[in-house]
């Protein structure tokens, strides 16, 4: 008699989106585009919040009322992550995450995460890791203490074989140099192979 194996599909991360709106951009197009990006990252979008950039808050990018609205929604509808359709500073990432108590991804980190999911070659995986490290390095001073909300299961600094996100400046800088050297080595090898084929 054959054994029956029940295959459980891993649930997609439940996310909410916040879109800062520019008067010159089409709101529906912006909503559709960021939703497609989230879908590509394996996310399940629960709700989209938006606010005019006129209400820009340097600390959290959104007004206090909007932040409270999202916080109240999350109390009733727990989600794994907030995706902000904007490039955030390290302090903004940390401030929003501290206010909401969940992981926060900005647009850049979301796109890097999609590349991580689709990277198949050795070079592709190295390039993803390099992009992640450079992203972290520019935001390092503000992200200290937020490590737990970047690593782990699901989207956000997802990478080949990574279980812990390194937030040490010297180690990051050293790894960036190593990764750049590895990429250059791969490119040189490819050039040499092409020259040999052409002979």
Question: Can you name each region flagged by the protein language model?
Answer:
Residues 7-15, 143, 147-199:
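Conserved G1/Walker A P-loop phosphate-binding module
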